[in-house]
Regions:
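Beta-strand-turn-beta hairpins that frame and shape the catalytic cleft
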Residues: 1-3, 111-121, 193-199, 228-233
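Active-site neighborhood of phospho(di)ester-bond hydrolases with catalytic His/Asp-centered motifs
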Residues: 6-7, 31-36, 57-62, 123, ...
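Active-site environment of divalent metal-dependent phosphoester hydrolases
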Residues: 10-15, 39-42, 63-69, 128-130, ...
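Active-site neighborhood of divalent metal-dependent phosphoester bond hydrolases
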Residues: 53-113, 117-121, 129, 134-151
Length: 323
């Protein structure tokens, strides 16, 4: 059994088309898209239409919830601020109602039970929290605590835009003979069993954040559990594609003008495959007093202080050529 796992397309139809072409060659038995199919890049409508024509399994991510929650009682009033949330406002006017209905019908997670393979759990973030994710640097104890109620040993997530293939072992209780506990004399079966999880993140199709601008996904192959814990071996893939049409779209569709600072930061992330949005927010919290400058003024001060805009221009394919 071979599964293709895609995630975090973020409206990048060109990256999605490149990955789909590679999947035609690889011929997996099934394709799963693990959330965040829309927003960030200006072609969400085309991505939704593309996915609706497939038989792929699709999961909602946090960006689908941004769209579905806006203009409802679930959205905070702060989302009405066009300076901070103009990107979302632009998206609202560029998806058709039936596309929104499609997003509303998607599940938040999947648990797959193929008869010839071990079960696996798939969520965009962590169970019950689609805006949380894991990284390769996160302590194993924190991950095992989060997954304690997940019975499946293979856990596929996304959200961080980072490719992950990591085995997590829950810390075992001290052996009774080490503590002097009378349980030392009990049967082995009464001791707390050792837990293990195989954490897999396919990376991002449309907007990777691991300093590699190629479109990224994963192939999972079912294997015996004594070969890989959880029974699924992962191979990560990275596909070169032409990013220039996606970058041009920020200007030709009006997203850059409507979305302001956030759209510009999304553009930067497509150029660098680095965490431009967190970089900016961390800098302004550390260096600027609250409620003094507008959001745009904060961003201009950030560029002036860090020279980050020059860093972007030196790498922008629309300015220097290449993909």
């Amino acid at each position: 059994m071979r599964l293709a796992i895609l995630a975090d397309i973020h409206g990048n139809i060109f990256a999605l088309q490149a990955v789909a072409a590679r999947l035609e060659q690889l011929q997996p038995d099934a394709v799963i898209v693990n959330g965040d199919i829309i927003n960030a890049i200006p072609f969400s409508d085309q991505v939704v239409d593309f996915l609706r024509r497939t038989d792929w399994l699709i999961i909602r991510g946090n960006h689908e919830f941004y769209y579905l929650d806006y203009a409802s009682g679930r959205a905070p009033a702060s989302w009405n601020d066009p300076e901070r949330w103009g990107q979302l406002h632009w998206l609202m006017s560029h998806l058709r109602p039936e596309q929104g209905d499609y997003l509303a019908s998607l599940p938040d997670e999947l648990t797959l039970f193929y008869p010839e393979a071990e079960p696996l759990r798939i969520t965009h973030g962590t169970p019950g929290h689609n805006r949380w994710g894991f990284s390769n640097l996160m302590p194993a104890e924190d991950i095992s605590t989060t997954l304690r109620d997940v019975s499946q040993e293979t856990f596929v997530n996304a959200h961080t835009h980072l490719q992950i293939d990591r085995i997590i072992r829950e810390s075992e209780d001290p052996l009774p003979e080490e503590t002097g506990d009378p349980a030392y004399f009990l049967e082995e079966a009464v001791r707390k069993p050792h837990r293990i999880w195989h954490i897999i993140n396919p990376g991002s199709v449309g907007q990777p954040l691991n300093s590699d601008t190629r479109a990224q996904f994963a192939i999972l192959e079912s294997v015996p559990t004594d070969v890989v814990p959880g029974g699924w071996r992962v191979s990560h893939h990275r596909i070169l594609y032409d990013r220039r049409p996606a970058l041009e779209g920020y200007h030709t569709t009006g997203m850059m003008e409507a979305g302001g600072v956030i759209s510009e930061l999304f553009y930067w992330e497509l150029v660098t495959a680095e965490r431009e949005i967190p970089f900016f927010f961390l800098w302004k919290r550390a260096n600027l007093p609250p409620d003094v400058y507008s959001f745009r003024e904060q961003f201009e001060l950030y560029k002036r202080a860090t020279g980050r805009d020059a860093y972007i221009r030196a790498r922008d394919p629309l300015l220097i050529g290449g993909f």
